[in-house]
Amino acid sequence: MLHIKGLCLLGVRTVWHTEGDGEFFCAGCGGDRGYRRRTGTRRLTVLGLPLLPRGSAGTVVECVVCRARSGPEALEQPTTTVFSAMLRDAVHTVALAVLTAGGSTGRAARETAVEAVRTAGFTDCTEDQLLGLLAAIVADEGRFPGAAGSLPADGLADSLDGCGSWLSIELHEALEPLSRHLAPQGRERVLLQGARIALADGPYLPAEREVLGAVGRCLGLVGEDTARILEAAARTPS
C-alpha cells in the first residue's frame, strides 16, 4: 500500500461475500460454533475506494465467535454433537454384530452389551430392545422365516459371508466414517468393547472372532493390532 501522511492513496483490499452459514467444530474455540462460508475478491483501492478487481482471495470458513478463518476442509470435521452420535451408533452396531455372531442366549453377554450401549449414549437401552432388534434383523434377512420373536442359539455366523450381507454393510457404514476422526487409541477402544461382549460368557467363538476381525478392518486397524487387542482382552480378568 502507498501511504502519504497516514492517508492510504493506493492499495489492495479484500471484499468478502457470505455464501452460506451453519455449525461446525472451531479448532480455535475448541467447540461447536456457528460459521459463515465466505468468498473473497481482491480489489485495487484508490483513496480507500475499491475499484478494479485483482483476482479471487478464495473461499474461507469464518467462525462467528472468534472470527478465525479456515479453509473449507474445516467443515469435514464433525461437530461434537455429530461425533457423539457417530460413536454411539458405532458401539451399538458392534454390540449387535457380536451378539448376532455369538448367539443371544448368554445373559452375561447381553448385560455387557447393554452396558456398553448405554455408556455410549443410548441411556434407555434395554435387553428387550436389543433382542427385539436382533430378531427383526433376522426376520428381514429372510434366513430364518418367522423368527421375529426369537434368535437361533448359534447366532448368524453365516451372515458374515460376502460383502453384501447386512452385517458387513452395517459395520462399514457405522465404523469407517468414524475411524477417520478417531485416534488409534479410540479405534482400539471400540474394538475392545466388542471383545468384552464376546468374552462375557466364555472364550471367543469362531464366529465372534470373525466379527471382531471385521470390526478391526472397518476401523482401519491392521490384522496384527486386532489380534493383539483380542488376545490382551482374553487375558484380562472380567
Positions of predicted regions on the chain:
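Small-residue-enriched hydrophobic alpha-helices in membranes
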Residues: 1-100, 104-238
